[in-house]
Amino acid sequence: MSTRFLRYFFEPNTLAVIGASEKNFSLGGQVVANLKDAGFRGKVWILDPKEVTELHGYQVFSELQELPEVPDLAVICTPADVAPQMVEELGQFGVKAALVLTSNQGHRQTNYKQRLLEAAQNSSIRVMGPECMGILVPGRKLNASYAPQNVKAGKVAYIGQSGMLGNAIIDWANGRGIGFSHLITLGDSVDVRLADVIDYINRFSNAQAILLHLEHIPDSRHFMTAVREASRNKLVLVIKSGRTPQAQGEPLLFTPGLPNRDPVYSAAFSRAGMVRVDNSEEMFDALETLTRMRPVRGDRLAIISNGLGPSMLAVDRLIHQGGQLAELSAETLNQLQAWMPSDDTRVNPLDIGGGATPQQFVEAIQMVSADPNVDAVLVVHAPTRLAPSEATALAVIANRKTYKRNLLTSWMGLDHAFPARHEFNLAGIPTYLSPEKAVQAFMHLVNYQRNQKLLQETPPSLPFETSRKARQEARDLVARIAGSGRDHLTHEETRDLLKAYGIEMATTYYPKTAEEAAQLAKKLPGSKALKVNHANNSYPFVYRKHPHKLSAGLLQDLETEADVGKGAERLEAKRAEKFPDSPFYSFVLQPMQRGKHSMQLNLGVTRDPVFGPVVLFGIGGYKVNILFDRHLAIPPLNMTLARELVASSHAGRLIVEHSNHAEEDLDRICQLLVKLSQLCSDLPLIKGLEINPLLLNRDELLAIDVQCDLGDPAYHAIMPYPEDLRKEITLKDGRQVEVRPIRGEDSVALLGFHSRLSEESIRFRYFHNKADLTKRDLSLLTQINYDRQMAFVAEETLADGSKEILGVSRVWTDPDNIRTEFSVIIRDDLQGLGLGSLLMKKLISYSKSVGTLEMIGKIMVENHPMRGLMKYLGFECRYNLEEQVIDAVLPLNEPVNDWQRHRLANPID
């Protein structure tokens, strides 16, 4: 992942088109014509070996070395067979960025993409493409693409992987008068990836929103890191194609335990704070909303129409999507009653009647939009003689400055409605073909706000903490099994693994013979269940074709020791017949759990080929189709995210509706989900783990049947909490302190820490007075992305067992891992104990270990203690005249290539 040289793609001052002619079908000719039509303000040169000196007014050169200077950007339109060689020559010439528009279709060049990538790597040039449409940056009058049209400047950045879809979006946007800050299609880009561009747009663009079209995700962690950061600053909408196996293409990817992988993408998008749209129509409607509406404050929608039928369509969709009808204030109700007396008590949706005039539409909007309980107003119009479509639209538009809330419109119909919708487009007011589409578009903004609110919530403190000893025992167990060459755990080994993480299993014995099973049955009161455990039934997510039939490897309701002994003989004989090559491990003997008013659940961890470990939850049991209620989340989980996962499921709703202790039950389930999340983070060799069923009753959660298998070390889409960075230290006054990475649950403690800082300490840290930390502040400071940030807290455990934060240090690292910026702050009453030095040394050690080249920080001139600490730690301190601060710089690692040396000398590149 890298933003290296990306500015040359989007902000070039000089540009060369390689391979262009005046022929109508010339790809390069189309690019040159677009540059001319867009009014590109920089220099353009054309490289073509033919005997031509000028094309579209631009000078043509036959040799690369003849160019007057090294261009910032090269657009390669040559045939595929020479494109890799051209890339390497451009890189050696000093060009930093190359767009490869050429497709390999029809050329049949073997290893085309690999050859392009190797050429880019050999010559230190960044390559976007092949098969990309190109780049449009209307604000800079740049159209380096083969798009058939230019686009207006706007505030939405579109980043996609399909050139043809990009063309369609341009045509649609021009028809609606909608603009873009950037329009970028990457095609099959071998070097510059989607996440690289997202990073660049987030950091360097003034775009207010990002619309993504995805076909595939080559690097899930880079992608999740980039979009998680972007969605904190901008609204990010995403549409994913290839949702079904039939549309996926080759190779087909599978996730054990899931009939369809698309829910994994939905879970990842939600976790990153994005809003997903389901189809191209919805995507276009979302664009309309993004470009023409201010951010909404909430989900309270008021609906005005000249007929109840159309407005009820909007109401149904609103409630189905989780929105709510605004409850109008008493003042607004009185105004409406005086304005239009009616016996109808329904005021939202507001039916102003089939006899309403254009002026009455305007008056209704003015009254309703002034209500403080309304977040947005939707106006639904059906054509009448008294309120013609176009005349009514023009009246609404003429008074738009008097409306106090966001306005959405749906002028229904086609013949008369079409010119009315055109007028709304010209006026920049969102308009939709149907009331349902308008509501859907409104809910995009609402869902974004909800996602952000969820991600900013402070997770409750964990009521448990797995000990280091238990985690190490679990690691040793898994390592021993993997070292033996076995790719799965036995039932007994899985029980021991879960026990290390505080997940209890029902009383279970593991007899090796029928005789031993009969003897052990004496220890269990009541009826028993018996299962045979062998290699073939030790794998998770292996289901029978008929889920309502009990497995042949399980016997239930065995009453006597003799029943158990005979049952064991029968099960072993069946195993030997059906699975003669499957090693026998043991029988699994448990008491039946009937009569405890239990609910059966299914929990587990599976591994997706793109996003890595995924946590699963839903209805469970031996005789149900558990796939119908399988919901999932991307780990690591905290209690808030676990609660969201449970709430999304049918099982969760059943608990809320039928349990007498719903909150306690939900808390217990969420704790278990967090433990599973921690387990898969601690043990990367775990490929899959399934608990089915897990029994929930009023007293306990009990795992009944479990399976677990192993694989290669997992690659997490979101970097897990770095437990290994915890360390105990002793301060000068003898007190014991733990230094550990910060986590989301620290918000309350961090707020308490902040309240004990002096105004001067706060000003030295934030460069201004900051008496309070907002909810958003706490979220940004505690729920960090460990892939690019790190924060260490020094925490002391008090005599009563409570904990408090004594100091915090943190770093923010750029996407290329070149520079990291630090900050450190210590409680005033603890300064002089060496804590600041210890926290800084922890930061320096960590940053060195991850390969960062340089640590920097800005210090107020009057902050003499910090300046002294920097000098002690070896930082070079110099006065920054422009910002009037001290810049502290510490080299951490030596650069290993020319690009890193270049970036250190040229931070903007």
Model-derived features with residue positions:
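Phosphate/pyrophosphate-recognition segments in soluble nucleotide-handling domains
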Residues: 450-479, 696-738, 893-905
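A structural signal for short, well-ordered beta-strand segments
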Residues: 603, 691-693, 706-708, 822, ...
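Catalytic-core regions of core metabolic enzymes
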Residues: 1-705
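Long, contiguous binding/interaction regions
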Residues: 713-909
